[in-house]
Amino acid sequence: MNTWLLSLQNSNSPTYDMMIFFHDFTMMILIFITLLILFIMFTMINNNLINRFLLQGHFIELIWTITPMIILILIAIPSFKILYLTDEMFNNKITIKSVGHQWYWSYEYSDFLNIEFDSFMIPSNQLNPNEFRLLDTDNRCILPFNYPIRILTTSMDVIHSWTVPSLGIKMDSTPGRLNQSLLYMYRPGLYFGQCSEICGTNHSFMPIVIESTNFSYFKNWLKSFL
């Protein structure tokens, strides 16, 4: 996994697919507007012709009033749709709970005999050659792909934020409040995230690792806790 890529990470969930589409759609509009303005500026600077009889132009004013309204509507429609779908819950098969602490995460699989464990960052001097500095943890959150999963999150102390960019998920972990989001992964793999809310001295050292596997491996992993 290249951690120095430009632009966005590769998508691994439907939510992030929609976010990437919205990003590209918005950038296309912004680039078009920028090029149009530059063209008009360049044309006017180099134009020696002057219309001395133009006092007002109702048609031009109508165009530059209605056009921005249409552009904003075109941006707002997919934006509201994505905002709604990120909070929508449907047919979730598994529920897990993520609890933020200073400065680590703990996970609870309450659907399966109350399985609980803590997830700490692996110090740099204990990393294996195939592990990532400041991103790998001693206990990964293992979940099956192609299954709708409900993620609950809260905090035991200060406000944290449970964020995995390649899955298009970011939730505030607030003390005394339970937030939820739907997670759906396309394929197996390791997905890395970090706390995205400044929460104290070691804020930069509480990573998140999601290991996406097939359901049979997930069941065998659950049996190891029995």
Swiss-Prot record:
Disulfide bonds: none annotated. It catalyses: 4 Fe(II)-[cytochrome c] + O2 + 8 H(+)(in) = 4 Fe(III)-[cytochrome c] + 2 H2O + 4 H(+)(out). It is found in: Mitochondrion inner membrane. It is a multi-pass membrane protein. Belongs to the cytochrome c oxidase subunit 2 family. The lineage of its organism: Eukaryota, Metazoa, Ecdysozoa, Arthropoda, Hexapoda. Its EC number is 7.1.1.9. Cu cation A1 binds at residues 160, 195, 199, 206. This is Cytochrome c oxidase subunit 2. InterPro entries: CcO_II, CcO_II-like_C, CcO_II_C, Copper_CuA, Cupredoxin, Cyt_c_oxidase_su2_TM_dom, Cyt_c_oxidase_su2_TM_sf. It is an enzyme of class 7 (translocase).
